[in-house]
Every structure is written in structure tokens, then in C-alpha cells.
Amino acid sequence: MPSMPIHSEDQYTYKLSVIVAVYNVAAYLDECLSSLHRQKRTDVEFIVVDDGSTDASSAICDQWAARDCRFKIIHQENKGSLLARKTGVMHSSGQWIAFLDGDDLFADDALEHMCSLADNCDADIIQFSIDVFNCNNKDQHDNILEYVNKPEKILKKNDTICASSFQKKSISWTLWNRIYKSSLIKKSYAHIKDVHLVCAEDAYTFFIAIFFSSKLFIKKTTPLYFYRLNTGVSTSRETIDLFTKHLSEITIIEHIREFLTIRAAEKSWFDACTALQTTLTNIAVYRMATLPEKDLPAALSLFFDTYDPVVYLPTLQNVFSGRQDTLACAAHTAFKQKDVRDSQTAHQRATPTEKKTVGIFYHRYFNGGVERVISQQIPIFLKLGYRVVLFTEQVCPEKEYPLPSEVIRVIVPDSYAQGRASIFLTALREYDVDVLCHHSASSHLLLFDLLLCRLAKLPTVLTRHETLAQDMSVGADYPFTPPTIFQLADTVCALSSSETYLYQQYGVNARYLPNPISVSAHEDIDAPSATGNRPTVLWVGRLFDLHKNYKEALEIFKKIIEHRKDVLCYIVGSGESREQNYIQNFIKIHKLQNNIVYVPYTPHVDRYYNSATVHLLTSSSESFSMVIAEGKIHALPLVTYDMPWLELLKDGKGHISVRQHDIEGAADAVLMILNDSILHQRLSYEARESIQPFLEYDLAGAWKEILETPQKIQPGVYQGEAPSNMRLLCDHIFSMYREGRRNTSSSFRTKEYIKQFMKNSPLIKRILPIGSRRREFVKKVVKNLYHRIR
């Protein structure tokens, strides 16, 4: 090789400088530097920066410098690849700059092509094509090439380049597949912070470079650069040590924002920076998801300290949707280790206020038992002197329960992908919420709502309106919330003592607390209800056949009417059109128009309790059934499917229980009460007596204690290191349930796809009415067709 370089026509000594940052890549470095040595051009220099390598890399660099005068070696203490490149750039003398990683290669004629591009393309950044090697996965190989290699185009404005790279992601932010004018890249590095960085340094440098650029030329060439896969920090198998290193990459966002602020950049640049923040955060979530479970608590602890929950919660929800119990256990351990609860709340008030503010969340405020509970809970909180903020996802003024004027209403999105975290958190801070009462314990968003509150250091009280048995019994496509998630709440209010005991075995701070029962509903009812002129049987509930069994209620009504033609039966509740159509068709087919009346949702259900003779309940599972409570308030004898865990039924008074799904038995029990006035009177008085302890319960006092000290550990909460025998048994049951759900989930999804097709097609609705034989035949055809396509 010649000993003297060929000078360019301007002030630069060389046509092109190649910067090679080296750190502990001895296994690949010789091959890398050899690819430079084979370049035929002499008007180039190779600046190799040894960034404090502890292997043989340093010696290999020196050997090549002795062999080829184009190599210039700089040895420095370890500063990270960002500053290693910066050192190389600032020591370069070329008109153009190219980058080569120490484990990658240049094509034999790469520099010839690069210099030709520099001479013939009027741009300050020129992109060329690359290839990937050491990759056994064709899809991965093709994906990288699709991301890096792009069709020829010219981007003439720097903000266009920025949007293309960081928002549209139509071009990569990698440094090594481009050459840069030396003046541009040196100016860029002059504004880059001297920070130790081994990840995302390309994004940082490229962002600053395009800010100062005026044109990027993308050229389709033969591969000039060969990218070695599965050796660098960004492609290595994730470990907790690597994950910790990766955490430093998010710091570039702060540096970029500072850079943009100083230069009073336009909003579009800040938007691009935010998009980059989201991308880096999402990458970190995916990396964390690949860690062994034993490392997840430590990773989460670091992650929570580093990243913004508003940015990462949507991706966290997406990535861990099928591993929520794993994430919950790891998060609980992480929070426990960090002891975040000892610090002050994250959102400080501008001025102290005497009133405590309580937030209440449920997805809606109409049409349901939980909503009715909340409508009765709000006056209790107001009477205690608290301010109340009601959070819901839906709003329907014409159907909602009355809301006191002093209650603040906030609507939040029903998805983290739609900005739920930001809107929720902003409102919690704006209204100085001191504690959040969350009523949606079976929501697929519960875990992430609890994480958001824990990270904001906001105490949460979770009310569990369902039972675990209910969740596990209604089908594989129904949300099942493992008790481990409840550990993230400060207090869990369960509606039965048996559920309370179960949660406590998981270390959940659970306590039994009955639902509020409206005073207005019972204050004027001092005697058993009269049967009236016509015996009446009442069924109240949502038309959700999965565990309310309204279809079985209709069959029970039919059998009762066969024996008592004078009986009037009411089925009161809301449901989708198909459920309502089913009821109407059932009544019509069996010619029961004079005996069965369907009443859609109404907030004035008391009038039906007042006129009823017997109350019927056909649920497979309930927790604290407001329907039972209201029936007992009205002194109605109850016939119910057996649910021995219910607090409202434990005393055995005021009701007759039959086996689950025993239609004959339920009909016989109702007829027995209708035909025996003495039995009716006894059960009626028992019902009134049975509800009395719940009416006298000091619910306001219990809630005041919870809201003032939500973190107070309740008696009975298991705090041992080793799991209790009860927990081990339940863990086994839950694991077997999940295994079974995985095995059947595809069949449930198939049914759901078919159901949606039949439901949403206008043509199908028109020519195939619900309940028709033709409709059932087409359903079978669609199902078979779907399986064939699968």
C-alpha cells in the first residue's frame, strides 16, 4: 500500500474517512479490518478507535496499523460507542465520513462506490444498500433488509427526513448504511452530549445530523455493507445485565429535547422526538418480555424508574396480555423491594385542602347491579365529607342513575392504545384524587390501572363484585383475573367472607364489606308485600345467559303457568337485541302473551318488586346480589339456584334453594309458595328479618376507615414466606384451568367469529331471521367453511 494519501481538491486531506468503533470484538475484528485493507482507494483513511477493550482487540488494531498506513489507531478508556465514534469523527480529515462496526464488513469495492456516490449525488447524506450475514432465519434476514434498504428517492427537507425516520419509520436511523459530509457530521457531534452510551447512539446521532442537513439521497446499489447478526449488544440474547445497559438509551430523549429547546425548533421536531421515545420504550418492553421470569422483578424495578408509564403501558398491556399473573407477581415483588409506599404521593397539591377527594371508577353508570351499588355509594361518601370524582368509559345520560350535582365526571378511553393512561393520570392529578375506588375487578385493564396508580403512588381500593368461581365457570373466552393481580391494590373489598379468606391466602389485603343498600328503597316497607289480585313471579337481571340463565327462567315460567294459568311472570332486564328477540319469540311460540311480560332495563324496578308475590333467581353464580337484597327488602319469598357462599343466603331464611339448573325443582318450589299462604307468609317475614343485619351494618364507618387508612393490613392476611396450603391448592386449580382454557380457546374464538358474522351482516339478518332453520343451516356452513380455510 502507498505510504502517502492522495489529497482532495479542497481543504480536506482525504476523500473519505471510515470510523471504526471497537470494543471487545477480537473474534471478528481481524475479518472486519481485513475488509478495509482490501479497499483499493488510497485517498481514504481508516480511523479505528479502541474504546478500552479488555480482550485482544487492541493488539489486532496495532497490527493492522503497522501493516497499512491508512489505519490510524486511537486508544482510549472506555466511554461507550457514541463517544468512540465522536472521537473518530473529530480526528478525521476526510471530505466524507462513513461508519463501520467492528464486527461487520465492507464489500471489496465499497469505498470506490461510496466515493462515486459522493461525486455524483448532490446531497449531504447519501444512503446505499446493505446485506445481512450470519443469520439462519430467513424472515429475520428479509425484515432487516426491508427496514434498511429502500427504493431510490430524494428527501429535500430536514423535517421531511425526520418524519420519515422517526414517525413514519419509512427509513432507518442506522448510521452505517450512509456516508455523510464531514462538515455536517462534525457539526452534529459538536452538539452531542459527552455521555456513555452503547445503545440508541445511532438514533441520537442521526436525529441531530438530519436537523442540520438539507438533503438525503437514497441510492439503490449493490450491497456495500455486510451487517453481522447476533453478535452486537442490540442483537444478543437478553440478560438482566444487557437489559440494564439498554436502559441508558432512553436518556437520549432528554438530550434531544434540550437540543431542540435551545434552538426553538418547531413542534414537528418535538413530535418526532416523542415518537422516538415511544419506539425506544416499546423496544425496552419487548426486551423485558424475553427475560427469564426470575429476572423480571429486578427488570421492572429498573424499568419503572426509567420510563414514562404513559408511554409504555399500552405496549406492556399488549405484550403481557397472556401473562398478566406473571407480570403482576413480578410487579408486586418490585414494588415491595423498592418500598415505594413510604415516599410522598407523586402528585403534590398546590395548596393543602381539608377535604379528601375520592375517585370512583367503573366502565359505565347505567344498566347493572354494580352501577346501582355505585349510585348508592356516592351519597355515603358525600355525607362523610369527601369530594367525589366519577370515572367511566361510557356515558349515556338518558339511562344513567341520578348523579349528585357536586360530583365531578371524567370520561376515559377504554384502551391504553387510545391514551387512557395520559387522560386518567392527568385527571387524577388535576382533581387531587387521594384514593381511587376501582369497581372493575374483572376488567382486562385492571392490572394496568393498578400499575398506573402504584406508579403515581395513589392508594387504590378494589371492590370485587364477582367471584372466582363465576369467572372460571362461564367459559374460556371470559376474562379470568388471578388473585395475584389483587396484590397490587392497597385494599380489596370482597362481598363474601369465603372470597375474603381465599384472597388473604395470596397475601391480598382483603376484607369483607357488603354492598350499600338504598335506604329509600326500604324505609316505607314495614310489612310483607301483598300478593294482590293476581299471583306474580318476578325475575330481575341482565340477559346474560352465560351465568344468569334467563332462558332457564323462561322454562321455569312455562312450567309454572302449565299448573297455574292465573300466574303473571315478569322478566326485567337489559340485553342485546338477540336476547330480547329470544324472549319475544319464546313468548310467541308458546302463546304466553297473557302470562309472561318482558320489561327492558328500567331504573324504577321497585314497582315490580312491590307487585310481586315470589322472587325467582336462576344465576349460576353471584357475589352480593343486589337483586336478592332488594327482594328481601320488599319481603319477597325467594326461589333460587343453590349458592351457599352468598352472605345473603347463609342464614337460610326467606328462601328455598334448589340444585343448579333444576328447572323442575325451581318451578315446583315457586308453585309450593304460591299455593301455600302460610309458607308464603313465613318466608316473607323471614326475608325481612334476614336483610335487617345488612341494613343496620355501619357501612359509612367501614368505608371511612378504609378511605382514611387504605394500607392498613387486615387481620387474617397471610404474610408468610412460603405459600399456605390453601394457596398451593388454588394455584394448582388455577394452573389446570388455564391449561384447559388454552386447549379450548380456539373453539371459543371460532364460535365468536361465526357469531359476529351472523350478527353483523345486514343481508343475513334480513333473509335469515333469528331462530329460523335456514339460519342454523347457514351457521353450520359458515363454521365448516371457516375450519376448511384454517
Where are these regions (language model features)?
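Conserved acidic donor-binding segment of nucleotide-sugar-dependent glycosyltransferases
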Residues: G652-I663, M672-S677
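A conserved acidic beta->alpha catalytic loop
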Residues: D50-A59, G80, E576-R578
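Membrane-interface aromatic/basic loop that binds lipid-linked glycans or pyrophosphate carriers
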Residues: A123, V285-E354, G720-R790
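Donor-binding/catalytic cores of nucleotide-activated saccharide
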Residues: L105-K220, Y225-T244
